[in-house]
Amino acid sequence: MFFFGIFRCNMDHWTTKRQVYIYLCFSLMTIALICYLIHICCHTKKNVVTNALPSNNMALIPYTPSNNMALIPYTPSNNTVPPPYTISGSCPQ
């Protein structure tokens, strides 16, 4: 009988401990989910802005047989504006 009394006290103790752990795990998972959603939202907003920009500061130069629509790196110097995108009107046969 004494054994069952100790067992019951221990069960109550572990039940309370388990409830605290479950509550803490649930709280941490909720906080992690909120942080993850904020992270995704920020990346989505960042991609909307960066998708409108030329990738890697590359400027498209007009077609000639020697460069064949090559991409060249654009390096700005002293408040210059990058050249506009141009596409050649002639198509190779």
Swiss-Prot record:
The chain crosses the membrane at residues 20-40. It is found in: Host membrane. GO terms for cellular component: host cell membrane; membrane. The keyword Membrane applies. The keyword Repeat does not apply. Glycans are attached at N78. It comes from the Viruses. It is a single-pass membrane protein. Keywords: Glycoprotein, Host membrane, Membrane, Transmembrane, Transmembrane helix. Belongs to the asfivirus KP93L family. Encoded by inverted terminal repeats (ITR) sequences. This is Uncharacterized membrane protein KP93L/DP93R.
